[in-house]
Amino acid sequence: MRSVDLALYADELAAEASMLAARLERARCRLQRAALEREARHALEATTVERLEVLGVLRCGETRAVRAEITDLTASLRAVESLQAWVEERLA
């Protein structure tokens, strides 16, 4: 295989890894936000919480689904990074 083809493939993999890393970071942020919102719900009055929910400021975060997404994205990112390492070895 030509080194140009490998370099192009490496670029595609880098873009994919970057996209997965960004999605993973957003999922982690959603999980952190859910924890903050859960804490706020306990600290604030019920009427305030209801008002904030109506406004969309407080959301009912499904943490189980977010945790599953984080697990999946982490595995996907590791797989892409493994392939990247293999391609980089071939380029060297």
Where are these regions (language model features)?
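Extended alpha-helical coiled-coil "stalk/arm" regions
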Residues: 21-59
